[in-house]
Swiss-Prot record:
Descriptive protein name: 3-methyl-2-oxobutanoate hydroxymethyltransferase
Cellular component per GO, a single term: cytoplasm
Catalytic activity: 3-methyl-2-oxobutanoate + (6R)-5,10-methylene-5,6,7,8-tetrahydrofolate + H2O = 2-dehydropantoate + (6S)-5,6,7,8-tetrahydrofolate
Recorded family membership: Belongs to the PanB family.
Organism for this UniProt entry: Neisseria meningitidis serogroup A / serotype 4A (strain DSM 15465 / Z2491)
Underlying gene: panB
Length: 263
């Protein structure tokens, strides 16, 4: 079974971590069998599964339900579950209560969004036995504050993002996830922190990659993001597509040049 120690050893050995979102047991079992290292029960289910316009309406009850479903299907992969909007920002104690519910539902780690200002919460959780994945850069729960889904950390804002990563690393984060960040900055962050980094639209030099399942299978309606690749193209089955994703992440051929953002 993949653990936080496994991920740390993978970073040290230069072995890339393959992560995908999963929301129910059958896909969790398929991905697990195909060699996916980490399954993310993401609040992206609000858009990918529930048909909402953002992740904000997703509830803790929703997250616990889908975490339970994924936990029934996965045998080897690590399960990371998102703390949903409004379930952890008010206080460290609120965050712990919500995280405890997700862990009881079958999560092995929880993910929270935010920079330096959330590092204290990261420390509070990890000191109480809950591993934390800190999501920085483009954080979808703050999409309305950002004014849309935009690349983060460009130009003069690069140092602030690096500070975010270091703050969470110092606080004991098990993983730092970067979304929509210039590739060179993501590389610098990865080299600057002791914990593994996972990228989505953050270049090939992160310690691992993640995509939303619906995106990598080409079944998400509407325009796809620059960092997305449809792995179903040329494949005969969903399992073959997932295996292709894992293989390309491990071989460092995904993401390619067309999937990354420059400064």
């Amino acid at each position: 079974m993949i653990t936080v120690n496994t991920l740390q050893k993978m970073k040290a050995a230069g072995e890339k971590i393959a992560m995908l979102t999963a929301y129910e047991s059958s896909f969790a079992a398929l991905m697990d069998d195909a060699g996916v290292d980490v399954l993310l029960v993401g609040d992206s289910l609000g858009m990918a599964v529930q048909g909402r316009q953002s992740t904000l309406p997703v509830s803790l009850r929703d997250m616990c339900y889908h975490t339970e479903c994924v936990a029934r299907g996965a045998k080897n992969a690590m399960i990371v579950s998102d703390l949903p909007f409004g379930a952890y920002q008010q206080s460290k104690e609120q965050a712990f209560a919500a995280a405890a519910e997700l862990m009881a539902a079958g999560a092995h780690m929880v993910k929270l969004e935010g920079g330096v200002w959330m590092a204290e919460t990261t420390e509070f959780l990890q000191m109480r036995g809950i591993p934390v994945c800190a999501h920085i850069g483009l954080t979808p729960q703050s999409v309305f504050a950002f004014g849309g889904y935009k690349v983060q950390g460009r130009g003069g804002k690069a140092q602030a993002l690096l500070n975010d990563a270091k703050a969470h690393d110092d606080a004991g984060a098990a993983v730092v996830l970067m979304e929509c960040v210039p590739a060179e900055l993501a590389k610098k962050v990865t080299e600057s922190v002791s914990c593994p980094t996972i990228g989505i639209g953050a270049g090939v030099d992160c310690d691992g990659q993640v995509l939303v399942m619906h995106d990598m299978l080409g079944i998400f309606p509407g325009k796809t993001a620059k960092f997305v690749k449809n792995f179903m193209q040329g494949q005969s089955s969903i399992q073959a597509a997932v295996r292709a994703y894992v293989a390309e992440v491990k071989a460092k051929t995904f993401p390619a040049a067309e999937h990354i953002f420059a400064d």
